[in-house]
Amino acid sequence: MPSLFARLRPASPPSSVAYDAAVNVARQPHWYRAGAVPDTMDGRFAVLATVCALVALRLEADGEGGNAPGVALTEAFIADMDAQMRQEGFDATLGKKVRHLVGSLASRVDRWRGVTDANWNEVVRRSLYRDQPVADDTLAHSVDRLRGLRKKLAALTLDKVIEGHWA
């Protein structure tokens, strides 16, 4: 009878699958070791927001078909940030802080939308390191990984992106 009960439970929304994939990519140790992103709440947020920005842009590239999944991805991001902030005890100013985090995601999306071969290093530096000094080899590692992620996302169908087949 488990299949009968499984049908009664709503399936995980596709947005949460894509968001879970983004979280899995952002948790990869290479960002914090070879990439030297600080392994702090802010550093982990920077990686997650950067990965989500690249996924959002890939969804956006599919035009109208990517609109609903893009909104759903953002909603999953907001719900997770809200839960994380509550867990950290930021209840008094939660709304303001979550709005700030969503604004940070939106600014990353805009920044990545305008990335060119000439400004990749600058965009990665701002997105992951917030203009902090970073060694050339460290920056090169992060640039390489983000270029690879962008290329992988671009090569997949919309369904595969939504299903997280890029993580």
Where are these predicted regions, by residue range?
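Surface/interface-facing alpha-helical segments and adjacent flexible terminal/loop regions used
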Residues: M1-A167
